[in-house]
Amino acid sequence: MTISPPEREEKKARVIVDNDPVPTSFERWAKPGHFDRSLARGPKTTTWIWNLHALAHDFDTHTSDLEDISRKIFSAHFGHLAVVMVWLSGMIFHGAKFSNYEAWLSDPLNVKPSAQVVWPIVGQDILNGDVGGGFHGIQITSGLFQVWRGWGITNSFQLYVTAIGGLVLAGLFLFAGWFHYHKRAPKLEWFQNVESMLNHHLQVLLGCGSLGWAGHLIHVSAPTNKLLDAGVALKDIPLPHEFILNKDLLTELYPSFAAGLAPFFTLNWGQYADFLTFKGGLNPVTGGLWMTDIAHHHLAIAVLFIVAGHQYRTNWGIGHSIREILENHKGPFTGEGHKGLYENLTTSWHAQLATNLAFLGSLTIIIAHHMYAMPPYPYLATDYATQLCIFTHHIWIGGFLIVGGAAHAAIFMVRDYDPVVNQNNVLDRVLRHRDAIISHLNWVCIFLGFHSFGLYIHNDTMRALGRPQDLFSDTGIQLQPVFAQWIQNIHALAPGTTAPNALEPVSYVFGGGILAVGGKVAAAPIALGTADFLIHHIHAFTIHVTVLILLKGVLYARSSRLIPDKANLGFRFPCDGPGRGGTCQVSGWDHVFLGLFWMYNSLSIVIFHFSWKMQSDVWGTVDADGTVTHITGGNFAQSAITINGWLRDFLWAQATQVINSYGSALSAYGLLFLGAHFVWAFSLMFLFSGRGYWQELIESIVWAHNKLKVAPAIQPRALSIIQGRAVGVAHYLLGGIATTWAFFHAHILSVG
């Protein structure tokens, strides 16, 4: 254990604030561009409004004072939380006022969730489809009903109260954001005190947060869900406060409650095994994880995080110092190792944000897979439309976060990187052999691209020539994903050894039986074959290209052979000035711009793979004799092995519903499908445009206005190159995502 000298410890964990550092001035805030001297002068050209949006949240450009930047970010976090609370409150309010939640609760297998009723202004009420239970509305696929049932909400009054609570929290967060910037603003050393921050985040936020949630799950969710599963009528289920205040109600369901806390203090914890379970698998009534397993998990997580929060050295001379951990972290081939990273992460919020976004984005994609492999909420697994939508949602959110990680890493390199601090450490060494990294990665991308695409081209050719025996397929030349099958197998078998007390395997997707709920498949083993091997290599190709673009942007953000002084040009610039041809699209920003297209590219294929695979091999109905009928009848293995198969049997075949939706409750998706294609096509006008073309056009239009004496005071300007690209990529992604939304929804709501 390390004992530290007192002089280095005296500044730890003292809450240090400045009083009233920045006056609250509505007059100042009302002036557009008040944060930037040149913007505050007002608009001379139309470029002003673009710069206003570009710089409003770019705190680095408002001031170079790290303390003030830190306070602005901290305060903005509270504002962000307030917005999230208002947003959640609005959704919960819809559930209370405009939904069929209680009808769904009493018959979740036959009633579909709806929380939006369209007003009949010019006939829009056609969108209010019959969702069962005598209710007409738009079917929602957000999974909120399943979440609310998991929470233990049994009536709409509870939803009203929760919605009001969300608004109260939003108000508190707004107040906190104002208070901690204008009244009591933390000093820089408070933001840089990483050990105290880790203690607070790990123990209080994650540890106590999980502990509090475990308490809710044990005292409210588990008993409520147990009664709902048993078919008890909603009006007969005790309310949450009754479970909490009347121990007898819980004792009836979980007898160990009668023993109170005695088993806890006598270390006889096994007595609590009736509500802290280790069942594994899914609840056969709801197709969701066991509520008591989830409670057990959150209790364990809480213990881990509370212990983790005690590891770091603050007021007392015991525990770890992050700086010491980093500076001692040297390997035989890493030079100075992690020396200097502490300075990077405590003086650059971009560096901090880049790592957080990369981790959180990766985690979000992992969550997408958990939602079908281990469905956490009751009746989620059999609501195929919701399953497809939350998978797609988490995949895309994860992609955006990862690209954001690369963006802020590049901004860190341009604005915050200090070569003096990073001498022969891991970051410096990576930068010094970046050519080897990028050229090898480029080779990998070319290899993967030609080989993965080549397998499909081979199959299309053989099928065109009528030679099925020569296809790469499960019935022709097999290319079985043997490593993936091996991993599935060991995960199916391992729990017998690693978790001998669990009653069921962790997830049915690795192997085991089919779980049906109400005649629909909730979970089943996902067998992998040649078709998955082929598409997996397309995934590998597109992900590697995305990484190539983003990593090149980060590693060459400060300099390159082409532009050695790139750091002086900033994070975003169109070209290296007039007179140097061939230097466009090299800025850090441009790599993010290009990376976004490949992110969208790669993740579209991921969600297409998931959608078709699940409809073909997992989702479907189960007859009384156990016969399973899948939605697309198992056509994935033979159709997904050719490009023509993807076009004909997936895109075209499954677009039937959206194309034929006019005149039905799904017609909005038909309009969206059309409109989003237009938005996507509109983006190309910005992406394939020349700035001079538009400037010439604008000047002739301004001439005409001058002739008529109606010339504008603010001079119109064509979009800059970067503005055009930003508008283009935004519409490209919006159009693409909304097209996919309409395509998926119309199809899965019809057949699912």
Curated annotation (Swiss-Prot):
Q: Provide the binding site for [4Fe-4S] cluster.
A: 575, 584
The note on cofactor binding and number reads: PSI electron transfer chain: 5 chlorophyll a, 1 chlorophyll a', 2 phylloquinones and 3 4Fe-4S clusters. PSI core antenna: 90 chlorophyll a, 22 carotenoids, 3 phospholipids and 1 galactolipid. P700 is a chlorophyll a/chlorophyll a' dimer, A0 is one or more chlorophyll a, A1 is one or both phylloquinones and FX is a shared 4Fe-4S iron-sulfur center.
What's its membrane topology? Multi-pass membrane protein
Q: Some GO term, biological process aspect, for this entry: which one?
A: photosynthesis
Annotated function: PsaA and PsaB bind P700, the primary electron donor of photosystem I (PSI), as well as the electron acceptors A0, A1 and FX. PSI is a plastocyanin/cytochrome c6-ferredoxin oxidoreductase, converting photonic excitation into a charge separation, which transfers an electron from the donor P700 chlorophyll pair to the spectroscopically characterized acceptors A0, A1, FX, FA and FB in turn. Oxidized P700 is reduced on the lumenal side of the thylakoid membrane by plastocyanin or cytochrome c6.
Q: Which HAMAP family match?
A: PSI_PsaA
How does this protein assemble?
A: The PsaA/B heterodimer binds the P700 chlorophyll special pair and subsequent electron acceptors. PSI consists of a core antenna complex that captures photons, and an electron transfer chain that converts photonic excitation into a charge separation. The cyanobacterial PSI reaction center is composed of one copy each of PsaA,B,C,D,E,F,I,J,K,L,M and X, and forms trimeric complexes.
Q: What is this protein called?
A: Photosystem I P700 chlorophyll a apoprotein A1
Source species taxonomy: Bacteria, Bacillati, Cyanobacteriota, Cyanophyceae, Nostocales
